[in-house]
Amino acid sequence: MTPADLAELLKTTATAVLSEHALDTSALPQTVVVERPRNPEHGDYASNVALQLAKKVGANPRELAGWIVEALTKADGIASAEVAGPGFINLRLETSAQAKIVNAIIDAGSGFGHSELMAAHKVNLEFVSANPTGPIHIGGTRWAAVGDALGRLLSTQGADVVREYYFNDHGAQIDRFANSLIAAAKGEPTPDDGYAGSYINDIAARVLQKAPDALSLPDAQMHETFREIGVDLMFSHIKESLHEFGTDFDVYTHEDSMHSTGRVDQAVARLRETGNIYEKDGATWLRSSSFGDDKDRVVIKSDDKPAYIAGDLAYYLDKRERGFDLCIYMLGADHHGYIARLKAAAAAFGEDPGTVEVLIGQMVNLVRDGQPVRMSKRTGTVITLDDLVEAIGVDAARYSLIRSSVDTPIDIDLALWSSASNENPVYYVQYAHARLSALARNAAELGLIPDTDHLELLSHEKEGVLLRTLGDFPRMLKAAASLREPHRVCRYLEDLAGDYHRFYDSCRVLPQGDEEPTQLHTARLALCQATRQAIANGLGILGVTAPERM
């Protein structure tokens, strides 16, 4: 019996109790919450449903809880139920009911934990979207890990997810990039507002390999040559780095296309139709303050050139016209103002601001022995995705970046995350999977097969804890997806790995020496098979490997 099954049983029982005592059944919440009590002595699960209902139906909470408990004790799978405190209900499950989660996991396999929670949603998930003027920095690397994990997570809950990279190839930063390449190709100092680092010299040299006469072209043509080839080379490197990191995108949208295809003009025309555009001081303004922004925004400047927000407006409209009912933007710590801005833009178009969600990521710092890690010589000013992967590997890099809530700054200790120790969270989880895999191989050599026919034998305290943690997996995924918090998967896996290690240390799974195999051995093998599957499923959502050997 999973927590979801138990919640449904509680709801059904409470409905019957309310009806029996002529109380209002409509007062029942849509979802009844069951939780694991902090003190295991209080039972396997607890619920406050009687406390929730009592005031609404005019009943004494302890009395109402008592009626529910009396009915629950007659239900299949309930070993005991009791009233605690002002009206809490504490429950213990029969071992056979609790162990049904093992069957559920083995039957579902890689689909265990999946649901149709978000099946009605077509989601555009835009993340990283770094300018093609340099390698992916550590902040963008955090989004590469978290965004990819979030996409996988939403997909497990039935969402139709499209991962999108918005290619910022329009604007002054691209011109500065081209000027930096030209200076490097000529052997001149980097312009004051240019980009520095050995990667600039590398790309400049490669531009000259592709266009040997580039420096002899007229200035405008030379600039365009370095701009076009340089951006293409830089973005190819970015995509290669992301791919090796395990992050790929379904769609790459060029910012420049919003302007060249007339999408910006179409967006402005639509806003004129809604009456949310006006002219002032020779510029065209969006009435964004009418929709929650702190001020109105210039869309077309007085020199008739589009402001940066013009591309954002066109891009949002483009997403909606492609059928996305949820547009998630994952932005850096310096983009807090974009939350109100993007929602105001949606409202100004006459769209639901709820179609826009903005996640803001905080800073990432690398440390070793408590000291900040110095900047990359290759890039001159930033630590890159490639630097982090070189230091600790892809799995540790992804896990370390996903493990904390995105609104929390994080310090990544390179010594810790590269260590083969239980203090390293990703090692701890992966080792549990490798240990389970070794156990399965050893069992096969002994001719033992996991057996789910005698799961009622799993009555040891540590087995019960492990079973309850396994039962939490589906609702953990639902919560993580609903809250857009893939870090919950990491924390769950660490709890599950810990519960497994403690179970393994207390409960012998395989017979030793001349000991004859028993039904308990094969039941425990089934429990281990289910645990291994749950860990593999969780690591898969994170884009982290589940090793067979370590």
Curated annotation (Swiss-Prot):
InterPro entries in alphabetical order: aa-tRNA-synth_I_CS (IPR001412), Arg-tRNA-ligase (IPR001278), Arg-tRNA-synth_N (IPR005148), Arg-tRNA-synth_N_sf (IPR036695), ArgRS_core (IPR035684), DALR_anticod-bd (IPR008909), Rossmann-like_a/b/a_fold (IPR014729), tRNAsynth_Ia_anticodon-bd (IPR009080)
SMART domains: Arg_tRNA_synt_N, DALR_1
CDD domains the record matches: Anticodon_Ia_Arg (cd07956), ArgRS_core (cd00671)
UniProt cross-references to PANTHER family, sorted A to Z: ARGININE--TRNA LIGASE, CYTOPLASMIC (PTHR11956:SF5), ARGINYL-TRNA SYNTHETASE (PTHR11956)
Name of the molecule in the record: Arginine--tRNA ligase
Keyword entries, A-Z: Aminoacyl-tRNA synthetase, ATP-binding, Cytoplasm, Ligase, Nucleotide-binding, Protein biosynthesis
The protein's assembly and partners: Monomer.
GO biological process, one term: arginyl-tRNA aminoacylation
Gene: argS
Motif placement: 'HIGH' region: 130-140
One GO CC term on file: cytoplasm
Subcellular location per the Swiss-Prot or TrEMBL entry: Cytoplasm
Family: Belongs to the class-I aminoacyl-tRNA synthetase family.
An example molecular function term from Gene Ontology annotations: arginine-tRNA ligase activity
Transmembrane segments: none
Any single Pfam family the record assigns to this protein: Arg_tRNA_synt_N
EC number: 6.1.1.19
Substrates-to-products reaction catalysed: tRNA(Arg) + L-arginine + ATP = L-arginyl-tRNA(Arg) + AMP + diphosphate
Broad enzyme group: ligase
Gene3D superfamilies, sorted: Arginyl tRNA synthetase N-terminal domain, HUPs, Isoleucyl-tRNA Synthetase, Domain 1
